[in-house]
Design a protein with these regions (language model features):
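Alpha/beta hydrolase fold serine-hydrolase catalytic domain that processes acyl esters and thioesters
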Residues: 1-24, 29-114, 119-123, 127-142, ...
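Gly/Ala-rich beta-loop-alpha elbow adjacent to hydrolase catalytic centers
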Residues: 173-178, 182
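Short glycine-enriched nucleophile-adjacent loop
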Residues: 182-191
Length: 260
């Protein structure tokens, strides 16, 4: 069954001008949030964006492929997705900026995100899902009973700060908990930015408590919210959803379907 690497073989030679942005592009860009850009892409929102080719080259100068492959992680493929992206016409000209990666054990807080400047002058804001830290998993559990988590609040702050061009078209997305953050940030961000947002993508991300999905602000953004789920989704079926969703086939089974 074809995957995102096959998609880049198939459509990687087409620019966004030739073939407009689609849901698979969203999933590919969401993977960039799992790459460690520490020392490569600065957190400063007004700093020059870093070309993907350059960021990929610097990453692989600092990291060993065999060591990454040996990790016990569902997200270890992300750097290889980035490497493939840098080789394609479709993604090689994207630029990265505003990378943050924060973990605060005492607050049970794990947050990471990166902005992707697209060749069509659009912006994709990618939020990272749960990492391998205990803190990250604790925050996941907190979502079940807290009306808002520190990570969700940080996502709102990040989105408000990262969108510096008030005329730019914006897409927001993430995988797993990153999808939840993408939706939460889009629902709670400044009205000006909400007007700029074209679509919000939750790639197998959990939903929210009923008070959130029934709120006026959530309902206002509902037409722009899109959830993408594998056939036997587990994470994406947690808590409540009201947005439209699309089910995709997966060659994996059980929780392994959560792997993008």
């Amino acid at each position: 069954m074809a995957n995102i690497m096959d998609y880049m073989d198939w459509r990687g030679d087409l620019s966004f001008e030739a073939d407009e942005f689609n849901e698979v592009d969203n999933l590919i860009l969401a993977q960039l949030a799992y790459v460690d850009f520490e020392g490569i892409v600065t957190a400063e929102e007004n700093a020059p964006a870093v070309p993907l080719k350059e960021a990929s080259g610097q990453f692989w100068e600092k990291n060993d492929k065999d060591e990454i492959l040996a990790r016990v992680s569902m997200t270890k493929s992300a750097p290889f997705v980035m490497e493939k992206m840098a080789e394609t016409k479709r993604f090689s000209d994207v630029k990265l900026r505003c990378y943050v990666n924060e973990i605060r054990d005492e607050e049970q807080f794990q947050f990471s995100a990166v902005c992707v400047e697209l060749p069509d002058d659009g912006l994709y804001v990618a939020f990272r899902g749960t990492d391998n830290t205990i803190t990250g998993w604790r925050e996941d559990f907190n979502m079940g009973y807290l009306s808002e988590t520190p990570g969700q609040l940080r996502a709102v702050e990040y989105l408000n700060r990262a969108v510096t061009d008030k005329k730019q078209r914006v897409r927001v997305g993430g995988h797993s908990k990153g999808g939840n953050f993408a939706v939460y940030a889009s629902v709670k961000c400044d009205p000006q930015i909400q007007n700029q947002i074209l679509n919000v993508y939750s790639n197998d991300g959990p939903g929210f408590r009923s008070d959130m999905v029934e709120s006026t602000e959530y309902q206002r953004m509902l037409p722009k919210l899109h959830t993408i789920l594998p056939e036997s989704s587990i994470v994406g079926m947690l808590l409540e959803h009201q947005e439209s969703f699309e089910v995709v086939k997966s060659s994996n089974s059980g929780i392994q379907q959560h792997d993008a």
